[in-house]
A protein has these predicted regions:
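Extreme N-terminal starter segment of soluble prokaryotic enzymes
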Residues: 1-3
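Conserved beta-strand in the GNAT
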Residues: 45, 51-61, 74-79, 197, ...
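A short, internal acetyl-CoA/4′-phosphopantetheine-binding micro-motif in the GNAT/acyltransferase core
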Residues: 75-85, 114, 214-223
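Conserved acetyl-CoA-binding loop-helix of GNAT-fold acetyltransferases
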Residues: 77-80, 86-99
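Amide-forming acyltransferase catalytic core, primarily the GNAT-like/NAT-type
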Residues: 129-223
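Conserved active-site alpha-helix within GNAT-family acetyltransferase domains
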Residues: 103-107, 113-131
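Active-site rim helix/loop that mediates acceptor-substrate recognition in acyltransferases
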Residues: 21-64, 171-194
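Beta-sheet entry/capping signal
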Residues: 43, 72, 107-109, 195
Length: 223
């Protein structure tokens, strides 16, 4: 088994495997992912019989950790073609990626697995459960609250609002920036979703997700 990090021009070659393994993802979302995320991520792959048969993606994030900034990678899109499973490809990819991140001085990495048990043998442990706030068109809102669909022009204000909220409540979180929300708006739109902004007296008081029903009921986490 040979594992290697793909060159920028090779990353698109993993799209076929992604579409095959993550068939529940819409075409528009996959197109978004391969247009946007491949700009700055890393992809490790195993090639056999002339094709990529397994892969692991490292998507970069800037985290706030006890008041300090840390550049870390989010492990995602770990996949092996069905006919090539149980050959140790996933373990090999994880070990290679973890060793490389350690060598680069990265303090830690994180992922949001479909099943916790898959990653326990690699010393991953649950540190938190993700809670998302969803928009309900039938909910009663406080008098004076105005709800609008988020657009790129709102991204800077959204980032400032969420940074203030997260700083007060969490020791570890993904840093919010204008670019973060511009990308997130585009990401939700790719799957038919919208971010809703709640404002009172001209100031943001909340941000919620308006998404398809299956996403609300426990679909894939956003990346």
């Amino acid at each position: 088994m040979e594992i290697r990090k793909l060159e920028t021009e090779e990353k698109q070659n993993t799209k076929k495997l992604y579409e095959e393994v993550f068939s529940e993802d819409s075409k528009s979302f996959v197109d978004y992912y391969y247009e946007e995320k491949l700009k700055d991520n890393q992809i490790y792959a195993v090639e056999e019989d002339g094709e990529i048969q397994a892969m692991l993606h490292l998507n970069p994030y800037e985290l706030a950790v006890n008041g300090s900034k840390k550049d870390v990678n989010y492990i995602v899109a770990v996949a092996t073609r069905e006919s090539y499973r149980k050959r140790g490809y996933m373990a090999g990819l994880l070990k290679q990626a973890l060793n490389d991140m350690y060598a680069d001085g990265e303090t830690f990495t994180f992922l949001m697995p479909a099943s916790e048990s898959i990653y326990l043998p690699f010393d991953f442990r649950t540190v938190c459960e993700q809670n998302r706030s969803y928009y309900d068109p039938e909910e009663e809102t406080e008098e004076g609250v105005v709800i609008t669909d988020a657009v790129n022009a709102d991204a800077e204000e959204m980032a400032a609002y969420m940074e203030a909220q997260l700083t007060q409540s969490y020791q570890v979180y993904a840093k919010r920036s204008t670019a973060y929300y511009e990308r997130l708006i585009k990401e939700y739109a790719s799957d038919g979703g919208i971010l809703k902004i709640y404002k009172k007296d001209g100031k943001i008081t909340d941000i919620k997700i308006a998404a398809e029903a299956e996403e609300v009921d426990g679909g894939k986490p956003k990346i």
